[in-house]
Curated annotation (Swiss-Prot):
Cofactor(s) in the UniProt record: Mg(2+); Mn(2+)
Lineage per the UniProt record: Bacteria, Pseudomonadati, Pseudomonadota, Alphaproteobacteria, Hyphomicrobiales
Protein name: 1-deoxy-D-xylulose 5-phosphate reductoisomerase
Pfam families in UniProt: DXP_redisom_C, DXP_reductoisom, DXPR_C
UniProt-annotated binding residues for Mn(2+): 156, 158, 227
């Protein structure tokens, strides 16, 4: 009997010009490129030249810039290639409407919400790197995944680690999940020292190479706070089942504790291609050119309980999870405004959490989200309130 080669898997990469998107294309190339995969859509924002190069080299059918102002530039870059071009919110929704098997959802911020939910409802497997989908709209996003019938494959290294060691037929026996954090550049800093943190010192992550905003989020532990809320929705957990531990070597990416006292951990060198490759190849494991652990050279693995006085973002995550509703969206929206103010020199490092908590308290009475409009409204209110609080503080 003759057996034909299976058709290439159809992929869309939302946010292809970012770090996750570039690493995804790298993994696709390593796993056979066009022989095994068909790139349907690539989306980016301001880096038009890179987006155009990616579209040409991958053979993408559609290239989308999220910024309408860059439409003509992208169209000019891709003139004569046969690659379709679109832009703005409508372009992102056109991208989401493509019939594909797998979507890398790596658009940063709330801009990624609508297209990722739409792709989920169409039934594509979603490799999720966008935090806002679960932090701001967790219940709605999980419902969209169930409606479409696709699989939700986490790409954050911590959630991907849990996904790898979570025994599907033993979910009832999960006692806790333990998210690891390096502790960032201020793991051992005093509260007094943290009051004088600058943007340059905050962006210097000890183990991972990341963009400016996510580096600062990691330094303040807001990134870990968002990951706690994500884990709640991803794995159907209760807030009290989610723990955070500092692990400065970043070798253990997360752990799952079971009712019999066993703890299963996923270890590996800090390289995002491992999580991306696993999400792309699931349920199989790919052969990737990443560093192999040499346990003889590791020497030691250290762990410390985080100090929530110096890192209050972790406490705010628990507060948001306990309150529920749109508190995740409020936390994220307020934090984004505070982060911008810190980068611009208008707010201190420690004050980011103070502003965020004030906004969460002020908007604790907002109703449960019935749809995405409610999520976006909560996000807007949080951002407006955060801006007002900072204006009042400056005036005083």
């Amino acid at each position: 009997m003759m057996t034909g080669k299976s058709a290439p898997r159809r992929l869309s990469i939302f946010g292809s010009t970012g770090s996750i998107g570039q690493n995804t294309l790298n993994v696709v190339d390593h796993l056979g490129g066009r022989e095994n995969f068909e790139i349907s859509v690539l989306t980016g924002s301001g880096n038009v030249e890179l987006l155009a190069r990616q579209a040409k080299s991958s053979g993408a059918r559609l290239a989308v810039t999220a910024n309408d102002r860059h439409y003509e530039s992208l169209k000019s870059e891709l003139s004569g290639t046969g690659i379709a071009v679109a832009s703005g919110k409508s372009g992102l929704m056109e991208a989401a409407d493509r019939d594909v098997d797998w979507v890398m959802a790596a658009i940063v911020g709330t801009a990624g919400l609508a297209p990722t939910l739409a792709a989920a409802r169409r039934g594509a497997d979603i490799a999720l790197a966008n935090k806002e989908c679960l932090v701001s709209a967790g219940d709605l996003f999980i419902a969209a995944i169930r409606e479409g019938g696709g699989r939700l494959l986490p790409v954050d290294s911590e959630h991907n680690a849990i996904f790898q060691v979570l025994e599907e037929n033993q979910r009832h026996a999960v006692e806790r999940v333990i998210l690891t954090a390096s502790g960032g550049p201020f793991r051992t800093a005093s509260l007094r020292d943290m009051a004088d943190v600058t943007v340059e010192t905050a962006r210097a992550h000890p183990n991972w190479s990341m963009g400016l905003k996510i580096s600062i989020d990691s330094a303040s532990m807001f990134n870990k706070a968002l990951e706690m809320i994500e884990a709640l929705h991803l794995f159907s957990l209760r807030p009290e089942q989610i723990e955070v531990i500092f692990h400065p070597q970043s070798i253990i990416h997360s752990m799952v504790g079971y009712t019999d006292g066993s703890v299963l951990a996923q270890l590996g060198a800090p390289d995002m291609r491992t999580a991306i490759g696993y999400a792309l190849s699931f349920p199989r494991r790919p052969n990737l050119p990443v560093e192999r652990l040499d346990f003889a050279k590791l020497a030691r693995l250290d762990f410390e309980a985080p100090d929530e006085v110096r890192f209050p973002a972790l406490r705010l995550a628990r507060l948001a999870m306990t309150r529920g509703g749109v508190q995740g969206a409020v936390l994220n929206g307020a934090k984004e405004v505070a982060l911008e103010a810190f980068i611009e020199g208008r707010l201190s490092f420690l004050a980011m959490a103070e502003v965020t908590e004030r906004v969460m308290d002020d908007l604790a009475g907002l109703p449960q989200a019935a749809g995405m409009d409610d999520v976006f409204a909560a996000d807007r209110e949080a951002r407006q309130r955060a801006a007002e609080l900072m204006t009042l503080a400056i005036a005083e």
